[in-house]
Amino acid sequence: MAVFEGSFVNASQFRLAVVIGRFNDLVCEKLLAGCQDCLKRHGVDPDPQGTQVDYAWVPGSFEIPLVARQLALTGRYDAIICLGAVIRGQTPHFDYVASEVAKGVAATSLQTGIPIAFGVLTVDNLQQALERAGIKSNLGWNYALSALEMASLMHQIRSTTGEVPRQTLPLAAAPSNFAGT
């Protein structure tokens, strides 16, 4: 029997995408800084002008799953990191957004076979968000580390089983000009 476990030895070989929500940008920019620090320390060049990491900025967390899915369907990425912050307010809006973002990111990963790190903070107040984005620790680092480990793990499994990631559009038909690459 085989034992599969991700490592960080060959992280410099990975191609990654990071999707970041602009809403609550004070928090999201700190998460991004932690993410980039982790990538750099593991041999990945996080420079937006480089060839290893692409960045997609979206209006808010609710838009993250759609863009993550579109990026995953290109087949260019070993993993995708999603960063955002949903902070509870006085209305049920928080519950809807937090739930749908989590479901959308999970569904995208399962449907495409591409590891997607869920780095969307869901917190009760700004103080909690800031604590998780740098005051006490920066979870952006953890989300990047998770993506690297999962990319490595999926490469191990695929190299052993011969499976390739799906590059189909499971929820809707592909547009006629979609090349799938």
Curated annotation (Swiss-Prot):
Binding positions (5-amino-6-(D-ribitylamino)uracil): F23, S61, F62, E63, A85, V86, I87, F118
InterPro entries named among the record's database cross-references: LS (IPR034964), LS/RS (IPR002180), LS/RS_sf (IPR036467)
Function: Catalyzes the formation of 6,7-dimethyl-8-ribityllumazine by condensation of 5-amino-6-(D-ribitylamino)uracil with 3,4-dihydroxy-2-butanone 4-phosphate. This is the penultimate step in the biosynthesis of riboflavin.
UniProt key word Transcription: no
Annotated binding of (2S)-2-hydroxy-3-oxobutyl phosphate, by residue: Q90, T91, R132
Domain of life: Bacteria
Catalytic activity line of the entry: (2S)-2-hydroxy-3-oxobutyl phosphate + 5-amino-6-(D-ribitylamino)uracil = 6,7-dimethyl-8-(1-D-ribityl)lumazine + phosphate + 2 H2O + H(+)
Gene3D superfamilies per UniProt: Lumazine/riboflavin synthase
BP GO annotations: riboflavin biosynthetic process
Pathway linked to the protein: Cofactor biosynthesis; riboflavin biosynthesis; riboflavin from 2-hydroxy-3-oxobutyl phosphate and 5-amino-6-(D-ribitylamino)uracil: step 1/2
GO MF annotations in UniProt: 6,7-dimethyl-8-ribityllumazine synthase activity
Active site: H93
UniProt-listed Enzyme Commission number(s): 2.5.1.78
GO cellular component: cytosol; riboflavin synthase complex
Protein name: 6,7-dimethyl-8-ribityllumazine synthase
Family: Belongs to the DMRL synthase family.
Organism: Synechococcus elongatus (strain ATCC 33912 / PCC 7942 / FACHB-805) (Anacystis nidulans R2)
Keyword Oxidoreductase: no
UniProt-listed Pfam families: DMRL_synthase
Recorded name of the encoding gene: ribH
UniProt keyword annotations, A-Z: Riboflavin biosynthesis, Transferase
